[in-house]
A protein has these predicted regions:
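N-terminal beta-alpha lobe that positions the nucleotide/phosphoryl donor
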Residues: 1-274, 278-294
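Short acidic-glycine loop/turn motifs at beta-strand connectors
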Residues: 173, 215-220, 279-282, 362, ...
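Catalytic cores of soluble metabolic enzymes centered on carboxylation/carboxyl-transfer
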Residues: 259, 298-528, 649-655, 661-664
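Conserved nucleotide-binding/hydrolysis modules and their immediate coupling elements
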Residues: 307, 516-519, 525-540, 544-550, ...
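Catalytic P-loop NTP-binding/switch module of NTPases
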Residues: 555, 559-593
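Structured functional modules or segments
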Residues: 581-664
């Protein structure tokens, strides 16, 4: 076995590889950028080498620096993780040229599967079913439009070198094709350095099912069953499971065999994933092959009991596959939820900032957390905003869903937006619970998933106020004078009456406590609520409320209190005299940047007339392109940025004047 390997990646996947390497007695070398100098993968590795500035193009995508780091440290092999250089044939070739083992497939296999158009031609020869479409080399815009017209709408424009949901556009009308093509090519060029695209018929209500395959240098191939990755936002997976529920067994077997045929067709070695787009009747079409380990590989590990990173290392070292096909079986059901720093209610835009509080669920044989993030870490604009992957196992799908709901209820994040509450609602959603799965599930259920009730139970408001009251009492046990009155958000009067003032969602909340026996009577919104409480620690309130004893998790900051209950979080701000509740969205006449990024297109100038939904400019953030659109028919008063400019979240991009209604 290897004595030392270098991991050419960061975050949770680097930590994941290090964990298995340690188990096998293999020394590890991490690489890091400026932003990652104190990252967990750097601390976990035996050695760490600095490779450049924070932008990935100046660090994690620098092939020469990574190769040199491996040579300088004596690493015999490089594990690429996923993303970054994991599917880069030039990187694999550089490893080969420097006598370093690339822990992945041969260069020829990466080349064959790296471009969607090329891979589809190979799969057609191998008898693997394909979605109807155009996969050729002619990239003339008018020609591609004609192909789309011939295929029939809706169609998908897909970057030939794409992946991860990037470089993809759904086009439903012929007149929208050329603008969508330009946007797709721009994103593909920025993300992959290759603007070639292919056109495919869009399958209505498709499922996204993938098969995990492995090959070795001895000509052996196996599959480790399938994963359903249908639940997606922005064409990116967010909740995955294994095995795929409610699929006919004969259809699954056909997919599994097609996946092995695909791997064999390119003499594949190592871990690979063959992805299929699946119609509701179970008919499957080859979509692409990912020549690397997938983000969602843990669900396969949970149902098979296999360590796929260990398989990768053994196969790369020249050993045969650890198991033959007849030795692999499915045990139970597993789910993976990707916990992101993002704002689901704002179109899932990434959230940037510091994680002020982080509590992971307790891990066990049934609950696993893969992460490279700890409390105090920054989520930056440079990399993917994933906080962690939460993976659960149950004896069946129903048990796994229950386990996931419970684990999400123990997963607490504060300091920046996150999708935990969204994930919990997703798990509880009837469509998901009943396995009515397709890639449009989130959009179809957005009323339930993205627009939770703004109402909040009085008991939670009173509990938040009680935490503030008890915190001040703990800090000031026997006050000699009413110093608490100096606080703008609460006060104590001479009749043992305590008033706490909070704010939630712009609404002022006033809660008055009067002492009674061992607890308080809280007056709020016309209700009288008896409550007793004790701070168990800095993040737990033990309380007796409405005759029930319970514990409530919370976090506090200088700005306010966040309560965590049943997968949901409830944020309360301290009410201050100088509180200024500014609209984050700007006014209709002032369009602002939803997040930090780079302006990639400016399509309007001052005095231009535009129609509602016209794209005014595009903003790229984390390699995803966002369109800034006109909210109404109107005139551009001013455009404040040019192509290539960096913008911050909240920067005013365009001053927009709606057209006055025409008088008849």
């Amino acid at each position: 076995m290897f004595e030392k390997i270098l991991i050419a990646n960061r975050g949770e996947i680097a930590c994941r590889v290090i964990r298995t390497a340690k188990k096998l007695g293999i020394a590890t070398v991490a690489v890091y950028s400026d932003a990652d100098a104190q990252a967990q993968h750097v601390k976990l590795a035996d050695e760490a080498i600095y490779i450049g500035e924070s932008p990935a193009a100046q660090s994690y995508l620098q092939i020469d620096r990574i190769i040199q780091a491996a040579k300088n440290t004596g690493a015999q092999a490089i594990h690429p993780g996923y993303g970054f250089l994991s599917e880069n044939d030039q990187f694999a070739l550089a490893c080969q040229d420097n006598n370093i083992v690339f822990i992945g497939p041969p260069v020829d296999a990466i080349l064959a599967m790296g471009l969607k158009a090329t891979s589809k031609a190979l799969m057609e020869k191998a008898g693997v079913p394909l979605t109807p479409g155009y996969h050729g080399t002619n990239q003339d815009a008018d020609f591609l439009k004609q192909q789309a017209d011939n295929i029939g709408y809706p169609v998908l424009i897909k970057a030939s070198a794409g992946g991860g949901g990037k470089g993809m556009r759904l086009v439903e009308r012929s007149e929208d094709f050329l603008s969508s093509l330009a946007s797709c090519k721009s994103e593909a060029r920025s993300s992959f350095g290759n603007e070639d695209v292919l056109i495919e018929r869009y399958v209505i209500q498709p499922r996204h099912i993938e098969v995990q395959v492995f090959g070795d240098t001895h000509g052996n191939y196996v599959h480790l069953f399938e994963r359903d990755c249908s639940v997606q936002r922005r064409h990116q997976k967010v909740l995955e499971e294994a095995p795929a529920p409610k699929m006919p067994e004969d259809k699954l077997e056909a997919m599994r065999q097609a996946a092995i045929d695909a791997a064999r067709a390119v003499n594949y070695v190592g871990a690979g994933t063959v992805e299929f787009i699946v119609e509701q009747d179970g008919t499957a079409y080859f979509m692409e092959m990912n020549t690397r380990l997938q983000v969602e590989h843990p669900v396969t590990e949970m149902i098979t009991g296999q360590d796929l990173v260990e398989w990768q290392l053994r196969v790369a070292f020249g050993e045969p596959l650890p198991k033959q096909q007849h030795e692999l079986q499915i045990h139970g059901h597993a789910l993976e939820a990707r916990v992101y720093a993002e704002e689901p209610e704002k179109g899932f835009i990434p959230a940037i900032g510091q994680i002020s509080y982080l509590h992971y669920p307790e891990q066990s044989d049934c609950v696993r957390v893969d992460s490279g993030i700890v409390e105090g870490d920054e989520i930056s604009t440079y990399y993917d905003p994933m906080i962690a992957k939460l993976i659960v196992w149950g004896k069946n799908r129903e048990a796994a869903l229950t386990q996931m709901h419970h684990a999400l209820g123990q997963f607490h994040v504060d300091g920046l937006g996150n999708n935990i509450a969204f994930l919990d609602r997703l798990v509880l959603c009837d469509s998901f619970k009943n396995a009515h799965l397709d890639t449009g599930l989130i959009q179809r259920e957005e009323e339930f998933l993205l627009k939770p009730s703004a109402d909040i139970r009085a008991e939670l408001v009173v509990s938040a106020a009680l935490i503030e009251l008890l915190s001040h009492q703990a800090q000031n046990p026997v006050p000699s004078n009413p110093v608490w009155q100096q606080q703008a958000f609460w006060r104590l009067n001479q009749q043992n009456s305590h008033t706490v003032q909070l704010q939630r969602n712009g609404i002022n909340l006033k809660i008055q406590f009067s002492t009674q026996d061992q607890g308080f009577v809280a007056s709020y919104n016309g209700q009288q609520i008896q409550i007793q409480g004790q701070l168990v620690d800095a993040h737990t309130l033990a309380l007796q409320l409405a005759g029930k004893q319970q514990k409530l998790a919370f976090s506090q900051s200088e700005q306010g209190i966040t309560l965590f209950q049943n997968g949901q979080s409830y944020k309360f701000n301290y009410l201050k005299s100088d509180f200024n509740n500014q609209d984050e969205q700007g006014t209709e006449n002032n369009l602002i940047a939803p997040m930090p990024g780079v302006i990639t297109q400016v399509l309007v100038a001052a005095n231009d007339k535009v129609k509602k939904d016209d794209v005014l400019m595009t903003l790229e953030a984390m390699k995803i392109e966002y369109s800034i659109r006109a909210p109404h028919d109107g005139i551009i008063a001013s455009s404040y940025f040019q192509k290539g400019d960096q913008v911050k979240a909240g920067d005013e991009l365009v001053e927009f004047q709606p057209l006055a209604e025409e008088v008849a």
